[in-house]
């Protein structure tokens, strides 16, 4: 089944709008001085005021927003990381396994022999970091975090001092050595499977910019390979730093392969979903052999991180009995059913060391799943949630012992006054491993608007220390998100992450805000649109009432009109004050000159003469 847009990017393709350059922007690349073979992408927003420098922003959209790039989804993206792995010389080619038969769904047309570690020399990013080795990936992400700057941004120390980072240690300038040290300590990860050479690496940790994940994936009730690839490109256009493919419908393997070969961002999955599909959807038939086979299959494809629900233990399940909403995690409910039907401990918990052994062969990172997360504010911070978190802390230590990178997943639904306790407990329990949270949603009354209530909690927990925020779309609890929902969810979460970065005192976070504030005060409407997260959306709103080109230079908008615009009035006040100040200054100079002449023109006066002089009724001294 060949899709038209997979063959070419025609103007009618679902990807046409996702691959156009951003208005008023250009794609730029930085080459680190200590690794000039690397090419790190950014976006620069060009401003209309010649006195304003271009504003550089992070850009996870890969080549899709580069007008110089040729996009061919059937060929996939350039495999630039392949040379990095080859230069290390510690991997070996394996035969791999044939792709499963998935009916008439079209497989990705190209095949590649998978790689895996060759020996016990350092291979994962964590092992390299502990050995004191700075990898290409570490240099790459340091350049990304600095937006390509060779030194700290002006005023960095003041911004750091002005923020409240709750114990985080953001540097004024991110160096590759700082990245290495954070990874070695387990406080950060670079998800980068050796079999995902198309990847543009990113770093996840609380001492770096807060990242955003977008979930995509088909279901038994809808979507297609074409739709999911389009959602991938759409999500990263609006700022998703990683993407999880949570497909549970048909052609899970083929869908994932198309996504991986065309993804410049890390891809995560929940292997349990495909394992369940392999046993016909019957959770009681799951076993280690099926799960192991699924893990290896996805490692060989190039998945960068796995959600593993190994913390759902048999003894924890009764703790959920009194909950308002029970177990709301798909993975958690599947494993709870397995545990109860067999009356055995979770086989993922029992075989966790074996899972570590598999993941370290490919440098796949753990995302330890929160299968017992609260699904309502009534259940927040309960015994079941924290019992699982304690288990995840112990499993984090086990994964580190095996040289595996780890982040830990978190809730969920948590009211605002209980959010910080989640962050504090995770840091203490999990040794400061990066926290990756779904929201949390701060109230349960927002069906259709859960991207808003969850972004409130996301901004707070991001400020408190969460390293990556998993987006929620308006369709949460209601249905499978489409492209419009993906965009709304990503933008809501980019706002939350950015707000957290500013509050933490990130040195460069506020530069974009300051630029848009100056543009707003100067009535540079096009600059305002282009500096925002959604330039097209902002322009469309302005066009609804002021559509003509002349309106883009007007000193008012339709909210206030020309006579009630506060910024226009502020300009008038400022201009008048400056003119008045000049007049007052001249009057004062004239008066003092007259006083000097009245004193006889003497430069030195005795005390009695000074006391005789007065200006505006005040003594002269």
UniProtKB/Swiss-Prot annotation:
A GO BP annotation: thiamine biosynthetic process
Designated name of the protein: Phosphomethylpyrimidine synthase
A Pfam family annotated for this UniProt entry: ThiC_Rad_SAM
Region of interest: Disordered: 1-29
GO CC entries: cytosol
EC numbers, comma separated: 4.1.99.17
Composition-biased stretches (Low complexity): 1-23
Subunit structure: Homodimer.
Catalytic activity: 5-amino-1-(5-phospho-beta-D-ribosyl)imidazole + S-adenosyl-L-methionine = 4-amino-2-methyl-5-(phosphooxymethyl)pyrimidine + CO + 5'-deoxyadenosine + formate + L-methionine + 3 H(+)
Cofactor binding remark: Binds 1 [4Fe-4S] cluster per subunit. The cluster is coordinated with 3 cysteines and an exchangeable S-adenosyl-L-methionine.
Function: Catalyzes the synthesis of the hydroxymethylpyrimidine phosphate (HMP-P) moiety of thiamine from aminoimidazole ribotide (AIR) in a radical S-adenosyl-L-methionine (SAM)-dependent reaction.
Keywords: 4Fe-4S, Iron, Iron-sulfur, Lyase, Metal-binding, S-adenosyl-L-methionine, Thiamine biosynthesis, Zinc
């Amino acid at each position: 089944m060949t899709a038209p847009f997979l063959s070419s990017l025609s103007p009618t393709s679902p990807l046409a709008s996702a691959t156009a350059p951003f208005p008023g922007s250009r794609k730029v690349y930085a080459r680190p001085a200590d690794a000039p073979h690397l090419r790190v992408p950014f976006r620069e927003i060009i401003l209309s005021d010649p006195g304003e420098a271009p504003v550089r922003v992070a850009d996870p959209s890969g080549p899709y927003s580069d007008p110089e790039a040729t996009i061919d989804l059937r060929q996939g993206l350039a495999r630039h990381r392949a040379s990095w792995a080859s230069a290390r010389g510690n991997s070996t080619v394996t035969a791999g396994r044939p792709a499963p038969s998935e009916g008439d769904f079209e497989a990705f047309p190209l095949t590649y022999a998978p790689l895996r570690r060759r020996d016990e020399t350092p291979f994962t990013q964590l092992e390299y970091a502990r050995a004191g080795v700075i990898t290409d990936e570490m240099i790459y992400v340091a350049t990304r975090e600095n937006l390509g700057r060779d030194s700290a941004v002006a005023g960095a120390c003041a911004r750091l001092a002005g923020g409240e980072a709750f114990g985080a240690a953001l540097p004024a300038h991110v160096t590759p050595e700082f990245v290495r040290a954070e990874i070695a300590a387990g406080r950060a990860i670079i998800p980068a499977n050796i079999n995902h050479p198309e990847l543009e690496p990113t770093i996840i940790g609380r001492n770096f910019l807060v990242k955003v994940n977008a979930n995509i994936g088909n279901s038994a009730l809808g979507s297609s390979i074409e739709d999911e690839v389009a959602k991938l490109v759409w999500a990263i256009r609006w700022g998703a730093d990683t993407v999880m493919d949570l497909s549970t419908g048909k052609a899970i393997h083929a869908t994932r392969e198309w996504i991986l070969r065309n993804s410049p961002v890390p891809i995560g999955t929940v292997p349990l979903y495909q394992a369940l599909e392999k046993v016909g959807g019957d959770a009681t038939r799951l076993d280690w052999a099926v799960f192991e086979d699924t893990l290896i299959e996805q490692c060989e494809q190039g998945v960068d991180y796995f959600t593993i629900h190994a913390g759902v233990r048999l003894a924890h399940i009764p703790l959920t009995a009194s909950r308002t909403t029970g177990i709301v995690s798909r993975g958690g409910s599947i494993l709870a059913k397995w545990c109860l039907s067999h009356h055995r401990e979770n086989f993922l918990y029992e075989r966790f060391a074996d899972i570590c052994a598999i993941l370290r062969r490919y440098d796949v990172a753990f995302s330890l799943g929160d299968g017992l997360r609260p699904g309502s504010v009534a259940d927040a911070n309960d015994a079941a949630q924290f019992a699982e978190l304690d288990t995840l802390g112990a499993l984090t230590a086990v994964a580190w012992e095996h040289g595996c990178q780890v982040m830990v997943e978190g809730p969920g639904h948590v009211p605002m006054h209980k959010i910080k306790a989640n962050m504090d407990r995770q840091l203490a329990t999990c040794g400061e491993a990066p926290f990756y949270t779904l929201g949390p949603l701060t109230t349960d009354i927002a069906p259709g608007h859960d991207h808003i209530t969850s972004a409130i909690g996301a901004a707070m927990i991001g400020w408190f220390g969460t390293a990556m925020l998993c987006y929620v779309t308006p369709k949460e609890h209601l249905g499978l998100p489409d492209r419009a929902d993906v965009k709304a969810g990503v933008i809501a979460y980019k706002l939350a992450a950015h707000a957290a970065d500013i509050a933490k005192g990130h040195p460069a976070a506020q530069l974009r805000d300051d630029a848009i504030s100056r543009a707003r005060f100067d009535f540079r409407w096009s600059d305002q649109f282009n500096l925002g997260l959604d330039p097209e959306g902002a322009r469309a709103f302005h066009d609804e009432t002021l559509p003509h080109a002349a309106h883009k230079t007007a000193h008012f908008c339709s909210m206030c009109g020309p006579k009630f615009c506060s910024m226009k009035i502020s300009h008038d006040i400022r201009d008048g004050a400056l003119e008045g100040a000049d007049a007052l200054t001249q009057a004062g100079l004239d008066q003092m000159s007259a006083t000097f002449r009245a004193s006889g023109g003497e430069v030195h006066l005795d005390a009695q003469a000074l006391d005789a002089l007065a200006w505006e009724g005040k003594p002269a001294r």
